[in-house]
Amino acid sequence: MEIGNCAEDIVKIQCKINHSNEIDNQVTSAIERLTNTGIRVLNQTVLLKGVNDHAATLAALSERLFDCAVTPYYLHLLDPVQGASHFDITSDHASQIYRELQNMLPGFLLPKLVREIPGKLSKTIIPTDV
């Protein structure tokens, strides 16, 4: 195997953009500088009540990210942290939003719906019963 030809050799950075309104010229310029050096940029979005809890909003975000050469990678349920419960969405509601999103986007623009469970080594995929 040649060095530099496998996925493990690609430098990856994960950003956290929750709404397409966050992507301005400064952000696109920074992403472009990263991708021009061969860095792959992935995005993790947190599903937030009142911010991005509609499939159309999330679809617009995925499309905008893709336009900037960013892969929409994870759609997180909110971690239970003090002072943020007003942003929380139930797993059932998140699954409903996700099913709508699946009907709006091609697979390569569809992030994985996940949650972090304390003590688990990796993210847990949320079933959507599709």
Task: Name each model feature, range by range.
Residues 95-130:
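C-terminal accessory regions of radical SAM enzymes
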